Amino acid sequence: MSDVLLVLNAGSSSIKFALYEAHTEPTADHLICEGGIGSLGHRPHFKVVNSDGSTRYDTYLPEGTSHDDAMAVLIGWIETTFPEHRLSAVGHRVVHGGALFDGPVDVTPEVIAQLRAFDRLAPLHQPHNVSAIEALAKLHPSLTQIACFDTAFHHRLPEVATAFALPRELTEQGVRRYGFHGLSYEYIAGRLPDVAGQAVADGRVVVAHLGAGASMCAMLRCRSIATTMGFTALDGLMMGSRCGELDPGVVLYLLEEKSMTAREIEDLLYRESGLLGVSGISDDMRTLLASDDPHACEAIELFVYRIARELGSLAAALGGLDALVFTGGIGEHASEIRRRVCEQAAWLGVTLDPDANARLSGAGRISAPDSKVSAWAIPTDEDLMIARHVWRLADGGR
């Protein structure tokens, strides 16, 4: 019986997973299958695809299926479908680790209690990340569970890059910039030498993780030195339904003049803003790019503008720029967004190769051969990054 590793990413209405062989440190070739249970709270859809993209399982679950029920269904399906494998460990994507966790950690009751303290700092993700850990612990109390943090890659940011200009006692209580999407950035940092060469990897690189959640990270020698997200995953770039950077005075105005509650403001900023709020149409960039509605065009323009603004800021933190990397769902697939960003980055030395950008599939260069600053698109793989952490920390790494 051979060991397998399970990677889980639990959200408000879904549980996504990937299953890997665990006889050696995982690579993309060790993926067995992946999928998830979506639309929880409505009509849950359970779909699994093989590593080659073919459908392995596709069904609907009863309406009213809870997250805990869905977890039981998923684990039961894995055990029934793969009787020749033993589930040796599970890795969870956990968005916020605060200042406590600078790397993956074995989950204990004490760790769970510490993670619960961050629920309010990442309300879209953290409560569901931790609930999945708790549900699995009830199903399999002896199963090794590893928490892998989106904040860990930024744990050694320079102090000046983490500080807010607030009274020192608040800073000492942990009110500071943490940064997120760290699992994605860590994966890209590992891929840079192979895709772009060691000289680029050792240089001044800005990576733009663009998806429903969006952020950017300035890397020097593949280490994070500045990032756009802050105390929470609400800061920085405009996102699918999140506002990004916002004058705190707007929050005070909503509290005092509009008599909104904290929970109403949370819903507004996290779930009703961003591309969705500006366009009034959708939080999906594909829908907006296909639309000729002026509000959709305005949302796209603002999205690109905010990226260009932050790119200049991060280049300043680096003292210059050697390479720009796009990743995430939008960064990997929306050549039009890449084109617009690169055109606005011409002053930094980015010269786009329009043909290379338009035809790119997978990882590759999209800048002209004579571009002073090279530009690249590299697909990310947060699941694989988690699987590697789990393998190193669990049985495979001991």
UniProtKB/Swiss-Prot annotation:
A molecular function (GO) term: magnesium ion binding
Record's catalysed reaction(s): acetate + ATP = acetyl phosphate + ADP
Keywords from the named record: ATP-binding, Cytoplasm, Kinase, Magnesium, Metal-binding, Nucleotide-binding, Transferase
Pathway: Metabolic intermediate biosynthesis; acetyl-CoA biosynthesis; acetyl-CoA from acetate: step 1/2
Binding site for Mg(2+): N9, E382
Subunit structure, as described in the record: Homodimer.
Name of this chain's protein: Acetate kinase
Organism: Rhodopseudomonas palustris (strain TIE-1)
